[in-house]
Amino acid sequence: MELKFAHIIVFFLLATSFETLMARKESDGPEVIQLLKEFQCKGKLRWPELIGVPTKLAKGIIEKENSLISNVHILLNGSPVTLDIRCDRVRLFDNILGYVVDIPVVG
């Protein structure tokens, strides 16, 4: 019994010593925008109004509002992506119904 209790204590100590892995929050937006400004990306950088819009329509809106965007990638939500930042790219994350589910951001 004491051995099980000791294992539980060790488990909790180890678990609390690791940084939690969590999804980025909406509040992280200003940090992303500041990073993009450091890269001197021009034009509109975010499109929060496109959440819930069909992805093909959203792609057209992004290309119209920022003519410097030459790569608008449509990806299924949760798809792996590279971490490099490019001022000419926007990733549109959609669901299986074809609607934008995350805020499109330059990068």
UniProtKB/Swiss-Prot annotation:
Coiled coil: none
Signal sequence annotation: 1-23
Site features described as Reactive bond, chain residue numbers: L83, D84
Gene Ontology annotations of biological process type: response to wounding
Gene3D superfamilies xref list: Trypsin Inhibitor V, subunit A
Organism: Solanum tuberosum
Keyword Cytoplasm: no
SUPFAM superfamilies: CI-2 family of serine protease inhibitors (SSF54654)
Propeptide feature ranges: 24-36
Family: Belongs to the protease inhibitor I13 (potato type I serine protease inhibitor) family.
Gene Ontology molecular function, alphabetical: serine-type endopeptidase inhibitor activity
The name this protein goes by in its record: Proteinase inhibitor 1
